[in-house]
UniProtKB/Swiss-Prot annotation:
Residues 71-91 have a biased composition (Low complexity). The keyword S-adenosyl-L-methionine does not apply. It comes from the Eukaryota. Belongs to the DVL/RTFL small polypeptides family. Keywords: Cell membrane, Developmental protein, Glycoprotein, Membrane, Transmembrane, Transmembrane helix. The chain crosses the membrane at residues 59-75. GO terms for biological process: negative regulation of cell population proliferation; shoot system development. It is found in: Cell membrane. Residues 1-25, 60-95 are annotated as: Disordered. This is Small polypeptide ROTUNDIFOLIA LIKE 3. InterPro entries: DVL, DVL_RTFL_regulatory. It is a single-pass membrane protein. Glycans are attached at N35, N38, N88.
């Protein structure tokens, strides 16, 4: 969307001499080749970058406020996927811990039964 801003249309892309810049060489055209109204919109000066960043910030805040842009939905999907992966990892970890505890209890129970059996067998 921002790339469209920098492309020249046939009416705006005319220089004083009548030449126009092609879209591929758009980046090499100088603002001195254009009249003053086009120079402010086409030159990549500090004010143009500030305007572009303000536009991007406003678009981002509008999308975050319920505008529902594609970039905001993809980033929210990415965050949702990360949260799911973290919860899945924690669930796997807790499941492994529960299984390890159960196995430990089972081994302890078997060892305790064996020891009690050996103690009882020695008494007879």
């Amino acid at each position: 969307m921002e790339d469209e801003r920098w492309k020249l249309s046939s009416s705006k892309g005319r220089s004083k001499s009548g030449r126009s810049c092609s879209s591929s060489s758009n980046y090499y055209c100088h603002s001195s080749d254009f009249n003053s109204s086009n120079a402010t919109t086409l030159s990549r000066s500090y004010s143009a970058s500030v305007t572009a960043s303000r536009h991007a910030t406003t678009a981002w805040s509008a999308a975050g406020a319920g505008g529902g842009g594609a970039s905001s939905s993809s980033s929210s999907q990415h965050q949702h996927q990360q949260q799911q992966q973290q919860s899945n990892n924690s669930q796997r970890l807790s499941k492994k811990c529960v299984e390890a505890v159960k196995e430990h209890r089972a081994r302890f129970y078997i060892v305790r039964r064996c020891v009690s059996m050996l103690v009882c067998w020695r008494d007879y």
